[in-house]
Amino acid sequence: VGVCCGYKLCHPC
């Protein structure tokens, strides 16, 4: 559980 930030996107995971 946390935050995944990739190519110009952030979402909970």
Swiss-Prot record:
Tissue: Expressed by the venom duct.
Residues bearing the modification 4-hydroxyproline: P12
Claim: Secreted is one of the keywords in the record: yes
Location in the cell: Secreted
S-S pairs: C4-C13, C5-C10
Cellular component terms (Gene Ontology): extracellular region
Superkingdom assignment: Eukaryota
Secretion signal span: none
One Gene Ontology term of the molecular function aspect: toxin activity
Domain notes: The cysteine framework is X (CC-CX[hydroxyPro]C).
Protein name: Chi-conotoxin MrIB
Organism: Conus marmoreus
